[in-house]
Amino acid sequence: MSVTIGTPLQSSAFKVLLLGSGELGKEVVISLQRLGVEVHAADRYDHAPAMQVAHYSYTLNMADPVELKKLIESIQPDLIVPEIEAIATEVLIEVENNKLATVIPSAKAVNLTMNREGIRRLAAEELGLPTSAYRFADSLESFRAACDDIGYPNFVKPVMSSSGKGQSRVKSFEEVDAAWDYAQTGGRVKQGKVIVESQIDFDFEITLLTVRAKNPETGAIETQYCDPIGHRQDAGDYVESWQPQAMTDAALTEAKRIAHKVTVALGGCGIFGVELFIKGDHVWFSEVSPRPHDTGLVTLASQFQSEFELHARAILGLPVNTTRHSVAASAVIYAGVDADNLSFSQLNQALAHPETDLRLFGKPEGFKRRRMGVATARAETTDQARELATQAAEHVQVIVASNQ
């Protein structure tokens, strides 16, 4: 089966609509551009990172069914690639059912993973995968009961949030009401529902990037895996990641089994970020994102094809290569201030080591804990790579430029 791509901005163009235009989407756009795809990028605010490298950009409320449907009808894309959760998924289901475009990886996957309830019930209740104990709550009263039922300490997350927003660790009943209030302000959609999870005694967390792509000879969808990525979080937000993460053969086999089972259930082609807890040979499912994962930014330095190139190739029906060529790490660069018109200095010091690199995302506005860039580094060991990446990130100074 031949894969054909036309010419951007002409009638033969193969068009992709990206819903959500953050830093991960920016790298996806660049990968698609290199393969001759015409890219349309949408987000809720102007000048988002991926918009800056797309052929066309649009600002709208993607959670509004009317606005989203109007945009899709005007573009008539071949593929729709969601990058965030806050999308009117009922429109994507309608688009897929009417065969107006292909939703990546599938409308079902996007709908299930848009909130933690859908994917947790699929993983634990339908697929029988090992997870933490959990309860859902949609009121303060039911939340108090859920916390008591699960026990302390527990973890609380809005069912619709990302990058640690609204998440907290509740150590006792005295902290329950404050955790509820924090969860209500941190979710992407203020629907109130939260998940309360038991604390798992684990050694480390990994992201297992799992790629579903077509075999170039048979056309059958096959599953491939990148080497496991270790990561460190602060308040639920990724701070640094490294590849590979050492683990036992038994744990890696079980991690792949879990990732295979959940991604097959979600269907479609593309990359999935499967988050797992590891203790010895034991593995628990945590979450899955049907798109590139923030911890996977390390693959820009470690693999022949980064997670973004893998995603672009897989959704276009092209062969993929998940091989890692280097030990590498990534470290986040935060804004550290609430301001716009930012500048970044000491970049020459940050890049002084030949095995370091930077990605500055180009976000138009900074907040103290907003990711504005990432440093990557290669080395002989993960500890050395982590140290190099962290040093590079710390060299970067964020300056509030004059608005004159």
Swiss-Prot record:
EC nos: 6.3.1.21
Residues reported in the UniProt entry to bind ATP: R116, K157, S162, S163, G164, K165, G166, Q167, E197, S198, Q199, I200, E205
Pfam families, sorted: ATP-grasp, PurT_C, RS_preATP-grasp-like
Keyword Ion transport in annotation: no
GO molecular function: ATP binding; magnesium ion binding; phosphoribosylglycinamide formyltransferase 2 activity; phosphoribosylglycinamide formyltransferase activity
GO cellular component, one term: cytosol
Coiled-coil segments: none
Binding site for Mg(2+): E275, E287
Top-tier EC class: ligase
Keywords: ATP-binding, Ligase, Magnesium, Metal-binding, Nucleotide-binding, Purine biosynthesis
Residue ranges of domain ATP-grasp in the record: 121-316
GO BP term, pick one: 'de novo' IMP biosynthetic process
Pathway: Purine metabolism; IMP biosynthesis via de novo pathway; N(2)-formyl-N(1)-(5-phospho-D-ribosyl)glycinamide from N(1)-(5-phospho-D-ribosyl)glycinamide (formate route): step 1/1
Binding residue positions for N(1)-(5-phospho-beta-D-ribosyl)glycinamide: E23, L24, E83, D294, K363, R370, R371
Keyword Magnesium belongs to the record: yes
Chemical reaction(s) catalysed: N(1)-(5-phospho-beta-D-ribosyl)glycinamide + formate + ATP = N(2)-formyl-N(1)-(5-phospho-beta-D-ribosyl)glycinamide + ADP + phosphate + H(+)
Function: Involved in the de novo purine biosynthesis. Catalyzes the transfer of formate to 5-phospho-ribosyl-glycinamide (GAR), producing 5-phospho-ribosyl-N-formylglycinamide (FGAR). Formate is provided by PurU via hydrolysis of 10-formyl-tetrahydrofolate.
Family the UniProt entry places it in: Belongs to the PurK/PurT family.
Subunit comment: Homodimer.
Protein name per the record: Formate-dependent phosphoribosylglycinamide formyltransferase
